[in-house]
Amino acid sequence: MSQIIDQVQAALQNIDKELEKYPALKELEKQIPVPKSYILLGFVGFYFILIFLNIGGIGQLLSNIAGLVIPGYYSLLALETPGKADDTQYLTYWVVFATLNVFEFWSKAILYWVPFYYLFKTAFLLYIGLPQYGGAELVYKAIVKPLAQKLVNIQPHGGPSDSLKAQAQSAVDAAESHVPQGHSTGVSH
């Protein structure tokens, strides 16, 4: 066992000697008291974990756990509180989450080639799902709401039905203005 440890330490020393060529690593080693070889091995290990997260179904599974379980738990808690702020936070989250999933569904063939996609997606879902960041509201106001207003005609203080009702009433009023006095249009208010 001690032979293996000696061989590993010798290999790490050789790596340290090779890494002496890079001033950035030397500076990093001064700032944090960790040998350059450990920094490199940590980076390589982290790199392979990221690759692992993006291969097969495990990346998608971990991302969905972060996107469903954690906000789902907070949503259940929010339903039991008397205030409305946390309800709004998670209703906004679920709208953003659904929008992301629709986008992801239609672009999965492209997203497959994005390196570390599931890692970025997981970080994004945690950002929008955890209440301390308020990311869902920011993403909703910056992206989803303007898109929804264009596509679905959502008005700030009324739904699509209010807008349609106002348009219909405007059309009735315009039609009535063209009907001579004393004649009925057959439309009641």
Swiss-Prot record:
GO terms for biological process: endoplasmic reticulum tubular network membrane organization. The short lumenal loops between transmembrane domains 1 and 2 and between transmembrane domains 3 and 4 may impart a wedge-like configuration, thus deforming membranes. Oligomer. GO terms for molecular function: membrane bending activity. Keywords: Endoplasmic reticulum, Golgi apparatus, Membrane, Transmembrane, Transmembrane helix. The lineage of its organism: Eukaryota, Fungi, Dikarya, Ascomycota, Saccharomycotina. This is Protein YOP1. One of its GO terms (cellular component) is cell division site. The keyword Phosphoprotein does not apply. It comes from the Eukaryota. It is a multi-pass membrane protein. It comes from Yarrowia lipolytica (strain CLIB 122 / E 150). Residues 56-57, 106-108 are lumenal. Pfam families: TB2_DP1_HVA22.
